[in-house]
Amino acid sequence: MATTVKPRGAEREEGATKGHLTILDHRTNKEYEVPIENGVISAMALREIKIDDDDFGLMSYDPAYKNTASTRSTITFIDGERGILQHRGYPIEQLAEKSRFLEVAYLIIFGELPTQQQLDEWVHGITHHTFLHENLKSLMESFRYDAHPMGMFVSSVAALSTFYPEARDVTDPATRLYQITRLIAKVPTIAAYSFRHSKGLPYVYPNNDLSYTGNFLSMMYKMSEAKYEPNRVLERALDVLFILHADHEQNCSTSTMRSIGSSQADPYSSLAGAAAALSGPLHGGANAAVLKMLNEIGDKKLV
């Protein structure tokens, strides 16, 4: 197991992140002290700054959450300028070298790397939920031949809520964990089916004898061969790519999912909303534009 490290900047003196902010309201000549905790002030503290008792109080205006945190999180630390990325305090270099994606997924969800027994149980639980209900498969087959894969993906993830109505009980920890397991297992299947549909290819059922990423490659690219053997270099590269993208702080899709989930909507509906946000050209859609450009180039000799 890796060794926990403090995020860059955690060694700063306590006085640099705690204390108070003094605000002088020139409208009333009143002075206010706003507590600072970990370099953050509460936006609700501004509500106390009023002209009189009937005043609503000050509000902060921050389009696009450019300087607003909606939650306290210990999942990911990023310092882009210094090239630092950590999940739960573990350097990304260490995780990419020594761990697999499902191990990192466990780390992100539970806060610690799993023991071998915990990892085996975790992988087994996910592996045996990779198949989709045949009715959901039929739903995906009903889309137009030229349907955009992201549109199919969003709709199919949302449809999962109709297959697992118990997911609405979001207050039960065991139920929540069950849906997490299902989503990690079924999202690659839905993604692969959406891709194959866009290519006019038949869907490939999951192969649970393969690794998480090996199975995904099989569902994406298996053709007429009796047994698909994933390219080991590509399989490992994809696993590392999944690790790098395992969490990206409070981005657009994360904020969308948290907003939907705050109403206690089921996890499938929440994730479908997040995926819809991801499809936008200013978010994950930018990756699609890059892939389109690479396909148009066609060969490295043309670069």
Where are these regions (language model features)?
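Hydrophobic alpha-helical bundle cores within soluble ligand-binding/oligomerization subdomains
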Residues: T3-V303
